[in-house]
Amino acid sequence: AGETWADSYACRLRWMQYCAGIWGYSTTNFTECAGFSGSLYSNYVNAGKYARHIPYYVKTNMPEQEAAYSDLTEVARILLITKGIQASDVYGSLVYTDGWGTRNGNVEILEPTFQTQEELLTTWNQELKEAANKLATSSNQVTFKNYDLAYSGDMSKWVKAANAVRMRIALRLLKQKPAEAKAIAQEGLSSGNIFSSI
């Protein structure tokens, strides 16, 4: 409930002028609140710690089962990118490719490189595409359906989620790179069956 409040009601809805009240918020509609934007960044950093540690942990401790944990790794990547988009909307450049080095066994990168939002969107689009393809074609996976609060381990729904997040990327690119945005949207819509169940 806290993230829904901060992200939707208290922040975005009023910034987009969908509603005008300032309940629960002591400044004007157009004043940035560090508490809300800080929580988006914290959520991104925390998601990254786990998303980057999962494949490293499996590779280090259970190398013979690495292929069986592909779905878990890709779902974590989708969640991390979703959080990254939210944080990048507020902060712009973020650490991503070089981030969480000690969590993925790369202890040599002590000063990771920040990437611009444009670079991040390109990277994230490609990674979401890869994640959707891997989830759609994987077999003999360790199940985590009892821990998957979103889709109860249904990987076809995670494929749709990956393609839906690609739609977010297309929307962010629409004014600056309309041809690229259109290509992403068409590819995502055709490959993800996003609207097949509506």
In which residue ranges do the predicted regions lie?
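Conserved, well-structured interaction surfaces
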Residues: 19-97, 102-143
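Residue-level preference for alpha-helix termini and adjacent loops
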Residues: 89, 93-95, 148-150, 154-157, ...
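A glycine-rich, coil/turn loop motif that links secondary-structure elements
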Residues: 67-74, 147-160
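Acidic, glycine-rich segments characteristic of secretory precursors and extracytoplasmic regions
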Residues: 1-17, 38, 53
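Carbohydrate-binding/catalytic loop surfaces
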Residues: 102-109, 147-156, 198
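Beta-strand acidic-aromatic groove motif in beta-rich domains, primarily in extracellular
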Residues: 4-11, 92-95, 181-182
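Aromatic-residue-lined binding/catalytic grooves and analogous aromatic/hydrophobic interfacial grooves
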Residues: 6, 122-144, 155-198
